């Protein structure tokens, strides 16, 4: 069935997951690794297969999707989130392909890498998250933004899938007390791997804690650029503003705090935020014990496109710390500041092209190792790893997508123009029981 049975290579300790699924219904182009292969069924009864093709960072790991019975138009497969041995997937499809403005079904699946319970990974379809639609006059699948859904594991069995948004607070009549005029709306499904019968979505309205005087622009046209699991919390981050830090997701009353990002070079609420966010990254490193914000500041002040002549960038990393102080319960401590001049002086042009780096992601194991993306502004996509402690490039530049000349992955090149988001770090490969599958192709 597979174009290449990629099951003989070593498995990385952690991987960088591409968000876009490579749908390849033709058996000749569907790539399969038997160690990561799984099958599932959508809510409409169609069968599909998935397989992750694993790669050592900075090369992204891809999810290949074979869905011959699935819709041919207006369909998409996405990797939504990951934590420990679980990965959250979503398949989108129109119920009626003849109506491009009709109802879209979003099926969520938990991909489970659990060597103790089965020979190969499993796919479990989650119950739908629904809401009433005035147009259809009935309950329909709730549309959760592609970048705004998080996944969090608790213990060996429990997990939660969550989306957090903001909503206006209703003022009490006659009230003069000055309060933040918004609340957090948490939509969460809590379940367990051992039992899924009682899993259901819940909506909770929660207050937001903060330590700032003026938040007038922070939540204006708020959107989430990514969700990062950190210890017992989910960080819903807007890369040009701050983090909605949702702690205690598995408790009856989770706590939501707003934490500003240390954005020294940007104006909050400025135009072009979606593209400016591509120069920032919130990373969990050192085995999940450290939360670090990485900021790449362009010297030319542009939000996108090739850099101006004779300009570069400054990369700064800062670690998030809880202080225990009631007045200022958290702070950002500067770890490293590296300029492009220093990097370019320490490395050859061939090993590190003189261009802007984007989508920074630190290694899940080592805080000094940064994986950075290079875009040629014509759809081409490359990656490079740098040791920030000595500013040395680690290995060659990896060509990921060839841009307009990439005929094999032309669909992904086109889709990335609309969803060029951060890669998702995941350690699920180390939960694969490779011994069980070595002799079972």
What are these model-predicted stretches?
Residues 2-162, 374, 382-387, 397-399:
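General structural concept
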Residues 134-154, 327-372, 424:
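A surface-exposed beta-alpha-beta supersecondary segment
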Residues 44-67, 181-218, 336, 345-348, ...:
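Acidic/polar, low-complexity linker and loop regions
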Residues 369, 376, 382-441:
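Blade-level signature of beta-propeller repeat domains, shared across WD40, Kelch, NHL, RCC1
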Residues 115-118, 192-196, 247-253, 317-331, ...:
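Short loop/turn segments immediately following beta-strands, especially the blade-tip
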């Amino acid at each position: 069935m597979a174009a290449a049975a990629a099951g003989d290579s070593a498995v990385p300790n952690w991987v960088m997951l591409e968000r876009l699924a490579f749908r390849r219904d033709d058996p000749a182009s569907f790539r399969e690794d038997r160690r990561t292969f799984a099958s599932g069924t959508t809510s409409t009864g169609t069968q599909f297969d998935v397989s992750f093709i694993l790669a050592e960072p900075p090369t992204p790991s891809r999810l290949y999707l074979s869905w011959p019975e699935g819709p041919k138009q207006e369909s998409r497969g996405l990797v939504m989130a990951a934590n420990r041995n679980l990965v959250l997937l979503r398949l989108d499809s129109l119920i009626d392909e003849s109506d491009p403005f009709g109802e879209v079904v979003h099926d969520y699946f938990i991909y489970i890498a659990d060597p103790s319970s089965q020979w190969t990974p499993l796919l479990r379809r989650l119950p739908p998250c629904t809401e009433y639609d005035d147009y259809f006059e009935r309950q329909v699948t709730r549309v959760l933004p592609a970048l705004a859904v998080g996944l969090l594991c608790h213990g060996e069995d429990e997990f939660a899938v969550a989306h957090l948004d903001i909503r206006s607070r209703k003022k009490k009549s006659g009230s003069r007390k000055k309060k933040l005029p918004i609340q957090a709306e948490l939509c969460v499904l809590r379940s367990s791997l051992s039992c899924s019968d009682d899993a259901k979505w819940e909506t909770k309205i929660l207050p937001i804690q903060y330590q700032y005087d003026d938040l007038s622009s922070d939540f204006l046209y708020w959107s989430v650029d990514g969700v990062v699991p950190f210890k017992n919390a989910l960080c819903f981050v807007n890369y040009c503003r701050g983090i909605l830090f949702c702690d205690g997701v598995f408790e009856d009353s989770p706590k939501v705090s707003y934490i500003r990002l240390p954005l020294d070079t940007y104006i909050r609420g400025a135009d072009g935020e979606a593209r400016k966010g591509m120069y920032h990254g919130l990373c969990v490193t050192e085995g999940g014990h450290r939360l670090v914000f990485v900021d790449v500041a362009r010297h030319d002040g542009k939000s996108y496109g090739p850099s101006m002549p004779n300009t570069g960038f400054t990369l700064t990393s800062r670690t998030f710390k809880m202080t225990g102080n009631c007045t200022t319960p958290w702070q950002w401590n500067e770890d490293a500041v590296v300029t492009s001049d220093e990097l370019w002086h320490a490395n050859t042009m061939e090993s590190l092209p003189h261009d802007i780096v984007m989508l920074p992601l630190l290694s899940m194991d080592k805080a000094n190792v940064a994986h950075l993306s290079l875009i040629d502004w014509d759809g081409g996509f490359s990656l490079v790893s740098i040791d920030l402690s000595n500013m040395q490039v680690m290995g060659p530049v990896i060509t990921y997508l060839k841009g307009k000349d990439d005929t094999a992955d032309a669909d992904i090149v086109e889709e990335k123009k609309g969803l060029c988001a951060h890669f998702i770090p995941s350690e699920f490969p180390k939960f694969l029981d490779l011994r069980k599958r070595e002799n079972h192709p």
